[in-house]
């Protein structure tokens, strides 16, 4: 059973219609799109994570199939790692594209997976809740998840902050953690357009305290972006956009197509 915990007192939350509440009478309304905000009180009222422009860009880009090879690999890995009725967390779920694929893959095994999507961006979680109405979605930080200890069979962590201690706390003994990270040459051609001195991503460090690495899978391919809209969407959905000055951002304005390297690593862990 996947139980949410109150971010104020830590007691179990119960849902009644459109409100989650605990026995200490702390209550949290469910938004019209289906998610609940469970950020700690100290973080309430602040804007966190991806903004609506970044979320819209990622939604548009992924809807065009450019990363379908990765989405398929994630879904296949989840089918191998989790049972049909597993309790699963998509930690840093974003707008829900991968979450949708994860749910469908597990449901295809004939069960009813309990899937929680958590992200610190309310804009992202809003879209995710609409994409996957079968799941539970909350605005939350992965540094302090509103979940009981040892409550999950599988954690999926895609391009999001990796919180080893917290993930270890909420994962069951014998459970699995699937982590997806970009490799060194990921999007190097995009960087070459924008930067005078394009740089590779740092090598992935597989060690994770409290976990043992079970297996890895590298996905390397090239994609051809067929319009300036897609080029801009890819750039906007990455962290590079907000780290890049206005003049360098303008360099993409004339690029109508671009062949880009994608390099991903899927790493599977179990609690040590």
Regions flagged by a language model, labelled:
Residues 1-48:
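N-terminal auxiliary segments of SAM/dcSAM-dependent transferases
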Residues 50-73, 77:
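Class I SAM-dependent methyltransferase Rossmann-like catalytic core
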Residues 87-89, 94-144:
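Class I SAM-dependent methyltransferase SAM/SAH-binding core
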Residues 143-154:
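A short acidic, Gly/Pro-enriched loop at the edge of an enzyme's catalytic core
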Residues 152-166, 181:
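A short SAM/SAH-binding and catalytic strip from SAM-dependent methyltransferases
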Residues 174-184:
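Conserved beta-strand signature within the Rossmann-like core of class I S-adenosyl-L-methionine
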Residues 191-210, 219-272:
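Conserved Class I S-adenosyl-L-methionine
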């Amino acid at each position: 059973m996947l139980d949410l915990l109150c971010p104020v007192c830590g007691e179990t939350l119960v849902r009644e219609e459109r409100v989650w509440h605990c026995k200490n009478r702390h209550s949290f309304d469910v938004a019209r799109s289906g998610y609940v905000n469970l950020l700690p009180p100290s973080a309430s009222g602040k804007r966190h994570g991806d903004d609506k422009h970044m979320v819209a860009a990622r939604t548009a880009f992924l809807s065009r199939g450019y990363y379908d090879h990765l989405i398929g690999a994630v879904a296949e890995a989840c089918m191998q790692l989790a049972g049909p009725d597993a309790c699963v967390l998509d930690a840093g779920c974003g707008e829900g594209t991968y979450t949708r694929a994860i749910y469908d893959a597990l449901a295809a095994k004939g069960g009813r997976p309990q899937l929680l999507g958590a992200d610190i961006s309310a804009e992202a979680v809003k879209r995710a809740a609409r994409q996957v109405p079968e799941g539970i979605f909350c605005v939350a930080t992965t540094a302090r998840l509103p979940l009981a200890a040892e409550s999950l069979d599988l954690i999926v962590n895609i391009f999001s902050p990796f919180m080893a201690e917290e993930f270890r706390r909420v994962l069951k003994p014998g459970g699995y953690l699937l982590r997806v990270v970009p490799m060194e040459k990921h999007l190097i051609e995009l960087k070459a357009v924008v930067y005078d001195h394009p740089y590779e991503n740092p090598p992935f460090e597989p060690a994770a305290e409290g976990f043992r690495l079970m297996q890895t899978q590298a996905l390397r391919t090239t994609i051809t972006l067929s319009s300036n809209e897609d080029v801009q969407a890819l750039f906007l959905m990455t962290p590079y956009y907000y780290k890049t000055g206005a003049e360098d951002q303008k360099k993409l304005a004339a690029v109508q197509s671009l062949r880009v390297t994608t390099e991903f690593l899927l790493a599977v862990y179990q609690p040590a």
